[in-house]
Structures are given as C-alpha cells and as structure tokens.
C-alpha cells in the first residue's frame, strides 16, 4: 500500500499530526484507541483509499502530535477535532473511531451534529458497567504495560510486541504501527506515549456514560463489533446487552459482527466481510 502523507494541523491549542491518504470522496476522519496511533488505520486505509480521502489523526499525547502534560478527556479531543476540521476547511466528514476513538466519535457526533455525515463505531462507544469496564482494562493491560518499558533496541521492542497472542497474525502493517511509536531513551528505546497522559485519559473515560449521547445522534451509524475476547469472553468491549442497547437507542444505527476478530484484529487484520459492510454503509445501502 502507499504510505500516507503526514501533515501538522491546528488542534485546540496543540499541533495535531494527521496521516493522509488522498481520495476523490470523503473525507473520513479516523480516531484511534487509548494507546494507539494514526497507523492503526493502515489496513482500512488501503481498503478505502483512493476512493475515499482518509484523515487519520494522532490524538494529543500520541504519535507525532504535541503532548501537553495535562488535558486528556473527551472534551479536549472534541475541541481538537473541531479545530482541525476548521483548519483544513472541512465542513462535514464521516467519522470512524476505534475503541476510545469510538467514544470520542460518538461524543463528537452528539456535540457537533452539523459536522458528521456518517459515524462508524469500531468496537467501542458502548455504555459499560463498572465491572465490564474493569474487564476491558484488564484485557488491554499488556498494551498499557508497554508504556513503562525500556528495551535495548528496536529489534528487542518488536520482538516483545510479537509475543502478544491477541495481535496475531503479525504483519507489515502491525510492525509499521509499532515502529511509528518508538523513540530513543536512556538505556534504549521506548514508546513515545507518556503513561501519565494515559492514566488521566483512563480515569476520565471511566466516568463517561456514553448512553447519554445515543438519542442526540442525528446521522446514520454503523457499529462494528468484535465478537472474540482478547483473553476471555469477559473482556469483549461490546457485550450483547451493550450493543443491543446501542442499536435500540441510537436513532439510525445498525450493527455488524466481524466474525473471528478480537478488539485489535477488527482493525489490524484483513476481513472482506467487514470491508464490504463499511463500503455499503458509506454508499447508503
């Protein structure tokens, strides 16, 4: 696939990095998960571009966006998205978010309905109970743990990431995603995401009751669900009761289960049925 063009744009008081794939339709603004970066969208960008323009942002504190010491909440991300659309001269976009990005996309569509043409929620945005949220954070614990680790070399970093059973099979796209986040530090290399930023983010997202946004959504919504857990069925991000409520309470929502995929595979792995579901939704079918 072709590599994206990187561009710095104005967020709400910070510079936000965008990975851009050109296309004649769109744009589709993509929002990643809590410890991810813009390169998590490479597989889907390869599917959707060049038909659609893909704009994948690094959230503040991640990737090549600026990393202020504080200010990690839905509210700040919404302001960043609104500001970057202004900076790019974009009135409306399709918004697609994965995991935390789905919560952000949902809230953005509720607060800025005039800016969202369609909304794709990829394995996120559900109103989870405290127990369900605890299970999710236990499931993503390995991703959180890597934020405090130092490895002797890039090769050692990648070797450690390859051991994760939940992100298999390994691919050039997954390797590129991890390479993108590596930076030098004393004693070797580490991720460029500071754990204190993610701790603030995690604390804030636990307080969000996403069901409060459901009735406010005015655009068509596609909810993509990963039916496989990371380590067990307990850490599924969209349990049946949760996704049932989403499609019942969001005025124009449909669901699509991406068979055989877990929370990471749903964006990192090839899946033709998923691709077709997205294409049909974008075309209004």
Which residues does each predicted region cover?
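Active-site loop/oxyanion-hole signature of alpha/beta-hydrolase fold enzymes
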Residues: 43, 55-96, 267
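Post-His helix in hydrolase/transferase enzymes
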Residues: 267-280
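Catalytic histidine-centered segment of alpha/beta-hydrolase-like enzymes
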Residues: 258-270
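Conserved alpha/beta-hydrolase catalytic His-Asp/Glu region
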Residues: 152-207
